Amino acid sequence: MKASLFSPLKMMHGAALGTAVSVAVSMLVASVAVAPADAVAAPAKSTKSAKAAASAKGKKRTVAAEKKAAHVAAAEAPHRSRRHVTLAAGPGRHHGAVRRVAFQPRQQSVGQAFGLHDTSDALALRSSVAYVVDQATSEPLFDKNSHAVVPIASISKLMTAMVVLDSKAPLEEQIEVTDEDRDYEKGTGSRLSVGSVLSREDMLHIALMASENRAAAALSRYYPGGRPAFIAAMNAKAKSLGMTDTHFENSTGLTSLNVSSARDLVKMIDAAYQYPLIRRFSTDRTYTVFTGKRSLVYNSTNALVRNPSWDIGLQKTGFINEAGECLVMQTTIHGKPIVMVLLDSFGKYSRTADASRVRNWLDAGGGERLTAANTGAGGT
């Protein structure tokens, strides 16, 4: 079974997933060819014939230049899809320089590297890991690579929220974002600038709803005992929930070392669902905060919460290259509480499309235990 390739953490250190994206920059400066003036005019020719001769020569040069340009364009055509071209012209300059930057394809996710995407399933999901459970009975309804241990990105923030609320720290306490809360591993940005001050409650709100990374980082730093104590509490909470495939290295999920399995995540979702604030904050559509400098309007990272046809009780999205597109949800379908875990999906909208495929399947009468193994795949 492919899942046997994975074990918490050991798999993570062996995979060649830290491939740096190399960027090759070259400067292309256009040169302008100027025809030399004739030193001596032919006296036997009239002015009119001289002009005609010059015109003919000019046409020959133009045709030759066009042929050369076409040849160069044809040679460069296969590489154009790999280059981003920017024209840079500074103030007072008379020429511009064309900068061509070659990009390598996005690095593989862990699931791609270990062949999890080779597992087919009856619903043709883009997610390499999928697990759907009847929340009331804990009965698995759909299973695809549910034992595989993979990075979970910002799904980690559900555990972050539980640890924050378990600490009983005052929700009204003001928390300031500092340089320590920047993302130095992935280099991601944030609208929450250094020096911003929000209440613990607001930080938790935007961390869950909008996956605001600096908010999650600041929450861990303000924990009693600091960030190391917070991470220890996350792992202790996971252990107490019986999450044996799970390990956390930070509160944001911006590391490939935050790993879990779909089966473990069902346990985490069930636990998080018991917190009313987590349910409310994670399913809000929009929320405005005042940072002490300005007001910021945040929107949910999950478009499905804005879709009235969905009844979502809890949700969280996640993405880093190593994890792919991730989505976990508690939702009600035909009066039945359902937990969905979709990990390592490829494509910007693929995770929500997969959720819709699962719901349509359940709407059509699906619901008996269906695994990738009994639909012709190589096992889960």
Where would I find each of the regions flagged by the language model?
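N-terminal secretory targeting signals
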Residues: 2-126, 364-380
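Active-site-adjacent loops and short helices of periplasmic peptidoglycan-processing enzymes
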Residues: 89-94, 98-263, 267-276, 333
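Hydrophobic alpha-helical segments and their boundary regions
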Residues: 11, 15, 19-20, 123, ...
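Domain-terminus/edge residues, biased toward the C-terminal soluble/receptor-binding domains
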Residues: 243-247, 253-380
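Secondary-structure junction/capping motif
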Residues: 62, 187, 199, 226, ...
